[in-house]
């Protein structure tokens, strides 16, 4: 996962973040100027082609310069099965769309989204928003 020390944030551009799940993918949007994230949508994750057609439509609409994928690390920091799926999804995003992908530790983001008052149908998008905000927050102003 990224280490912000010594790295600079791009000056401008849109960022899409994904909270990957086997059934649904939460999506958030932000940009490097405001460094604020907002929940965007939830994509159904039924077929591989359907998933990437939906992502392609978002990329075409928002023209991001960076993609972020939440990495579901277990509470002790170790590997868990869903990490492989999230890592594969991020690698596929990079391969299909040629955009840089970074992973962000998503521990407890779904719980935080629920505690923040996100309704049941909005949890995945709100979790993606939290993931993206964590990404922005790791860089000093």
Swiss-Prot record:
Q: Where in the cell is it found?
A: Cytoplasm
> Mainly localized where?
cytoplasm
The cross-references to Pfam families, in alphabetical order and at most eight, read: RuvX (PF03652)
NCBIfam families for the chain:
RNAse_H_YqgF (TIGR00250)
Q: What biological process terms from GO does the record include?
A: rRNA 5'-end processing
* Documented EC number(s): 3.1.-.-
Q: Which family does it belong to?
A: Belongs to the YqgF nuclease family.
Which top class of enzyme applies to this chain?
hydrolase
Q: Which UniProt keywords apply?
A: Cytoplasm, Hydrolase, Nuclease, Ribosome biogenesis
Question: Which sequence ranges form a coiled-coil region, renumbered to this chain?
Answer: none
A GO cellular component annotation in the UniProt record: cytosol
Q: What is this protein called?
A: Putative pre-16S rRNA nuclease
MF terms in GO: nuclease activity
What is the role of the protein in this entry?
Could be a nuclease involved in processing of the 5'-end of pre-16S rRNA.
Q: Which PANTHER family match?
A: POLYNUCLEOTIDYL TRANSFERASE, RIBONUCLEASE H-LIKE SUPERFAMILY PROTEIN
């Amino acid at each position: 996962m990224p280490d912000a020390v010594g790295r600079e944030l791009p000056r401008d551009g849109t960022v899409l973040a994904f909270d990957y799940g086997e059934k649904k993918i939460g999506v958030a949007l932000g940009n490097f100027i405001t460094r604020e994230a907002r929940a965007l949508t939830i994509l159904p994750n039924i077929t591989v082609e359907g998933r990437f057609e939906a992502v392609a439509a978002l990329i075409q609409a928002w023209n991001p310069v960076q993609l972020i994928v939440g990495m579901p690390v277990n509470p002790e920091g170790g590997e868990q099965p869903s990490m492989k799926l999230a890592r594969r999804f991020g690698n596929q995003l990079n391969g299909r769309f040629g955009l840089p992908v970074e992973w962000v530790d998503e521990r407890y983001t779904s719980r935080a989204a629920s505690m923040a008052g996100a309704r049941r149908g909005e949890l995945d998008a709100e979790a993606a928003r939290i993931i993206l905000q964590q990404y922005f927050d790791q860089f000093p102003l």
